[in-house]
């Protein structure tokens, strides 16, 4: 694919051809590139109660079954037993060792093979190949990111640090009641397209529109991602920004971060909503929400007050758009230079 498929000048550019949303071959090529990226694994508070956490979503992103362990530190390990390939762990738990439920092979929380029944007399056993492989793991302010030799967009976290690094993100608390998992009949990229512009807010999200100053809504681009900044109307909930914040003095209602390919970090005065956009097939996508609370007194207020309603409204639009782009009467559209710079930026990444 050539990046010139999407003209770098948004005023001249046409949107992605519909085949990006409808054809299996294009879908497979795009998703294969996800293994080059870092992906959200968990917030450290998710490992406070359980010290073993399988990462089911990573199979879709990097083609590997992974798990996190917490002992003297955090590790991302292969979740595949080195004996016969059984998954080592299928649910979060607390354990001093990892024990495969198939034939009892046991590993330390560092991934090293500890014990294997009925293996007396096996030559050259154990060896390093019997240990669980360790994957790349990066930690930023309590957020853990994993990958399988990731090489793309490694500097995105510096962008977050400069803007929201003042928040005590590491001390945010995982709230299981805010967990959601949806499956929608639409291509994953259509869901991302919708997220990356506030253009549709007055038409689709009536209640959210009442919270945000539409004319002040802005989009900022950086390598590997997009930031959208929602400004609160005068009477609505907003951040109490410190002087160290580059946005000090503004009524910020929300910071909406998207990192390629499918991570959304939505910072509200109450805390953080993490959304994962997980491709299942060319026309099927799973959306997973995790909530991490900073200030419970602000839950239910402001731009992040009713995420379930906003999600339902978005899903209806995205599923209807999937039906539309499958029509023979549609292939490509144009961008609003004022309102769709984030979508244009995303499409340039996909086309490259």
Say what each PLM segment does.
Residues 37-41, 48-51, 116-121, 256-261:
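Short Pro/Gly-enriched beta-strand edge/turn motifs at strand-loop
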Residues 35-39, 86, 200:
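Generic structural signal for secondary-structure transition and capping sites
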Residues 67-71, 78-79, 138, 143-352:
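C-terminal catalytic domain of Rieske-type non-heme iron oxygenases
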Residues 20-61:
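Non-catalytic accessory segments flanking enzyme active sites
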């Amino acid at each position: 694919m050539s990046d010139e498929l999407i003209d770098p000048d948004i005023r001249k550019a046409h949107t992605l051809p519909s085949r990006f949303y409808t054809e299996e071959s294009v879908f497979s090529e795009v998703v294969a590139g996800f293994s080059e990226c870092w992906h959200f694994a968990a917030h450290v508070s998710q490992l406070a109660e359980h010290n073993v956490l399988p990462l089911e979503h990573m199979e879709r992103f990097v083609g590997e079954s992974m798990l996190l362990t917490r002992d003297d530190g955090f590790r991302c390990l292969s979740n595949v037993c080195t004996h016969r390939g059984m998954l080592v762990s299928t649910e979060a738990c607390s354990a001093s060792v990892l024990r495969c439920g198939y034939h009892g092979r046991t590993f330390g929380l560092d991934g090293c093979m500890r014990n294997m029944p009925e293996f007396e007399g096996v030559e050259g056993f154990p060896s390093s190949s019997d240990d669980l492989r360790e994957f790349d793991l990066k930690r930023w302010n309590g957020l853990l990111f994993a990958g399988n030799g990731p090489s793309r967009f490694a500097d995105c976290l510096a962008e977050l640090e400069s803007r929201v690094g003042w928040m005590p993100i590491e001390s945010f608390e995982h709230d299981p009641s805010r967990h959601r998992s949806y499956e929608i009949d639409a291509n994953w990229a259509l869901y991302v397209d919708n997220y990356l512009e506030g253009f549709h807010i007055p038409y689709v999200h009536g209640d959210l529109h009442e919270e945000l100053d539409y004319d002040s809504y802005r989009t900022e681009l950086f390598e590997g991602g997009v930031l959208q900044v929602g400004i609160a109307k005068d009477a609505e909930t907003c951040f109490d920004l410190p002087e160290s914040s580059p946005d000090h003095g503004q009524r910020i209602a929300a910071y909406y971060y998207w990192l390629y390919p499918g991570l959304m970090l939505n910072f509200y005065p109450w805390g953080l909503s993490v959304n994962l956009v997980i491709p299942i097939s060319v026309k099927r996508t799973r959306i997973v929400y995790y909530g991490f609370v900073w200030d419970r007194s602000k839950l239910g207020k402001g731009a992040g007050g009713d995420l379930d309603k906003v999600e339902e409204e978005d899903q209806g639009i995205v599923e209807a758009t999937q039906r539309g782009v499958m029509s023979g009467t549609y292939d490509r559209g144009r961008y609003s230079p004022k309102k769709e710079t984030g979508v244009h930026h995303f499409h340039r990444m996909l086309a490259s």
